[in-house]
Amino acid sequence: MSENLDKSNVNEAGKSKSNDSEEGLEDAVEGADEALQKAIKSDSSSPQRVQRPHSSPPRFVTVEELLETARGVTNMALAHEIVVNGDFQIKPVELPENSLKKRVKEIVHKAFWDCLSVQLSEDPPAYDHAIKLVGEIKETLLSFLLPGHTRLRNQITEVLDLDLIKQEAENGALDISKLAEFIIGMMGTLCAPARDEEVKKLKDIKEIVPLFREIFSVLDLMKVDMANFAISSIRPHLMQQSVEYERKKFQEILERQPNSLDFVTQWLEEASEDLMTQKYKHALPVGGMAAGSGDMPRLSPVAVQNYAYLKLLKWDHLQRPFPETVLMDQSRFHELQLQLEQLTILGAVLLVTFSMAAPGISSQADFAEKLKMIVKILLTDMHLPSFHLKDVLTTIGEKVCLEVSSCLSLCGSSPFTTDKETVLKGQIQAVASPDDPIRRIMESRILTFLETYLASGHQKPLPTVPGGLSPVQRELEEVAIKFARLVNYNKMVFCPYYDAILSKILVRS
């Protein structure tokens, strides 16, 4: 995820990494309101929120309290994103085309640069605006320096001495081109390698106003680079503190909004009830008679939590609100859910194919991998609105039959008969239905594997993959590791809340 955030705040966070840990984390997330506020507003206005159960009595809140809560959510979300998303980067702000903000910005900037052009065209030239720009450039260059850059700091301070520049301007001795040359050279020294080309192009601009305009444009890009460098530098520091920080921020939100655990409670209650029902069915004696009260299965808090996390992989994101404590990772859980749905279809297709084909064909690694890649490619757009699973499975059936026939021919085995082709195509097309037995078996085994992995404490090696899932073992293990990381981090942050809720639920049950 990349966000359009305030660069200077994140940059300062990088400089503060040697300070107190709590202050460092506060600095890292300071000033992020604008970028994430839209997500908060859209979530609060979503129809899903209308369904909130009122387990806590309603109370009136002030606008200030709401804004403070929003800021807390924003800062917590940003800290979480930096820690959880290893690819997190800030990107330059790009205003939408033809938007009011973009037009206003262009008008204001044009007026400013036109004014500068007029001043420099006077006889003698007026350098008031130009000197202010040099001052801004000086501060920006100094902000890029680390504490050990003493020589560069002295050079910038000496050459871009505003008092001396003003005196030279008053005496008609100011060489603005010489200052620009020094600035470009210093930018080349401080910029990231990715900006070398942009800095090099500045040397080809001869007119002062266009040159200054492009200098500021490149400096903005360098600010983004510096902010991302700061984030990568402080990420290990944030990892150590983020659990306490997120828990603290959530507690502050909970104190302002006492009903902020309603959906979590509902989520854990459902998980407990579902798990109890499953265990009770398994505990029934042969013949279906009810077991005695002493034989009733008992649930552990850990088992309920793990099962609750598995339920997130079958969530109806359009109809049901996501539990509050996992809301920041909703997109990640949803992405894993989509990956597992695709793996389920892929695994089911491969299972019926290898079951119908000649014995031993699945043991040919090259063929199995080739067939998997073909099906995988055809399922790539599975979750796009324009994707029609039935039609694609028809195409997959045709392609699979061709590949199987070709493989059998090369191996010298008996040819794949027309009757077998018809049956195989029919079984592959049947996978389109969520109630298809093969598809349900694959889904159940995948969830069992994930549950076993969570229960094992994420130890290596991973649990043995259930039967029928060997062709998709690598993909399944990758998903399992991502899923376990999300779950583990969420548990570390919110375990005290889960324990408190489950202690009441399990006593009642």
UniProtKB/Swiss-Prot annotation:
Whether Phosphoprotein counts among this entry's keywords is yes
Q: Which residues carry this modification: Phosphoserine?
A: S56
User: Which species is this record about?
Assistant: Homo sapiens (Human)
| UniProt keywords, alphabetically | Phosphoprotein
Identification of the protein by name: T-complex protein 11-like protein 1
Segments of this protein annotated with the region Disordered = 1-60
Which GO terms of type biological process are on file? signal transduction
Acidic residues compositional bias, start-end:
21-33
What gene is this protein translated from? TCP11L1
GO cellular component entries:
microtubule
Q: Which InterPro entries match?
A: Tcp11 (IPR008862)
**Matching PANTHER family:** T-COMPLEX PROTEIN 11-LIKE PROTEIN 1, TESTIS-SPECIFIC PROTEIN PBS13 T-COMPLEX 11
Q: Into which family does the record put it?
A: Belongs to the TCP11 family.
